Amino acid sequence: SPHLAGLKHIDLWGNLLGDLGLKAISESPYLKQLETLKLWKNEISDDSIELMVVSDNFTHLKILMLNDNLITPAGAAMLASTSLFPQLLTLNLFRNDIGDVGALAFASSKNFSSLELLYLGDNKITDQGAVTLIESQYFPRLKVLDLAMNPLGEATMMAAFKVNNKGK
C-alpha cells in the first residue's frame, strides 16, 4: 500500500507468514526505507532468503530478526554473500539450522563490517564454525556473538579466551 511508503519498522513476530510474506515485503515498492524487520517464527525458508538478498528494500536495514525459522546453510550463505545490508547492526538467526557451513560463510564475509550484534544460538554450530567466527577479521565492530545452545567444546572456549586476552 502507498500508505506504508515511509514505514521504517515492521514487527510480524509469530505470524507464520512463510515465504509468501517475505516475498511481499521484498517486492513491495513502498518499503524501501525499512530500518527494522522482525520476522521471528514465520516459517521463512531459503526460498525467501534468495528473494531478500537481491531486493533493494533492505539497504537501510539496521536490525534483521530471522530467528526461529527454517534457514539452512544455503540460506546463511546467501545472506553472507549479499552486500545489500551495509548498515546492518543486528542480525538474529537464533534457532535456525545454519550449522558450520553457515557460520563459515559469515566468518569469511566482508559484507558485515558494521555488525555489532550477531545471534547464532541453537544452530548446530560446532567448534569448527564457532572458532572461525571468533577469529574472523571481518567483524571489527562486533560487541556480541551469541552462540548459546550449540554443541561447543573446549576449542571454542580457548579461542574466545585467546581473542579476549590479546594485547594484555
PLM ranges: what are they?
Residues 2, 6, 77, 81, ...:
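Intrinsic disorder/low-complexity segments
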Residues 2-9, 29-36, 56-63, 83-90, ...:
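Leucine-rich repeat
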Residues 6-9, 19-23, 51, 151, ...:
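Terminal export signals
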Residues 15, 39-42, 66-69, 93-96, ...:
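Consensus "Asn ladder" position of solenoid repeat domains
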Residues 17-26, 44-48, 53, 71-78, ...:
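The leucine-rich repeat
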Residues 92-123, 132:
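Ampipathic, surface-exposed secondary-structure segments
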Residues 127, 131-168:
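Leucine-rich solenoid repeat scaffolds
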